[in-house]
Regions:
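Extended alpha-helical interface modules used as scaffolds for assembling large macromolecular complexes
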Residues: 2-193
Length: 193
């Protein structure tokens, strides 16, 4: 996470597939990333936030996240489907808005900074929340994962097996192959022979 967040060489703006550039974008990817990470770190730890609402929040609070000093007419950008030029501040949502959305649904999710959510009918993510690792990652530390595997399980006289989630994965796989799935209760998986 630290290597990515401080990189000058990775430019996520080039991952926004809905836009094309006449020449390489003259943005500062590290600064843009840093500004977005600051906004994420200032958000409440609990609750879900609409991606569109967050894009609007960035628009109101930090509109120059990509094109610094009002360079809205200086970059030659066009819509990749229609070829229409996207010049001027009126196209902020198509450029900066898509960038913010892509960062949430892409790198912020890939690195475990945010969790995504959507309704059953939606095709793409509609909301996000800070993950349980967000504070740790934003402070430059690696998240802690369980280091020890559980060796405890229950096998009762009725052929009911209860295995802890942290039981060795290869053994859980074998149990799942020869048993019928029963239920998951918290961090425990239940099977029946």
């Amino acid at each position: 996470f630290h290597a990515w967040s401080t990189s000058e060489n990775l430019n996520e703006l080039q991952l926004v597939s809905s836009i094309e550039f006449g020449k390489a974008p003259a943005n500062n990817p590290r600064l843009s990333r840093s500004l977005l990470l600051e906004l994420i770190s200032s958000m409440p730890e609990e609750g879900w936030f609409g991606i569109d609402e967050f894009v609007g929040y960035v628009h109101d609070l930090q509109p120059d996240i990509l094109r610094r000093a009002g360079e809205y007419d200086a970059w030659f950008i066009k819509d990749s489907e229609t070829g229409q030029p996207l010049i001027g501040f009126q196209h902020w949502r198509e450029i900066e808005g898509w960038y913010v959305q892509m960062m949430i649904q892409g790198p912020f999710t890939w690195f475990g900074l945010v969790d995504l959510g959507k309704s059953a009918e939606a095709k793409t993510s509609m909301c996000f929340r800070r993950s349980r690792w967000a504070d740790t990652l934003l402070k430059g530390r690696a998240p802690e994962y369980p280091t020890t595997e559980s060796r405890n399980f229950i096998l009762d006289k009725n052929g009911h097996i209860i295995i802890d989630r942290y039981f060795p994965r290869d053994i859980r796989y074998q149990v799942a192959r020869f048993c019928d799935w029963d239920a998951q209760k918290g961090n425990r998986y239940e099977y029946r022979i």
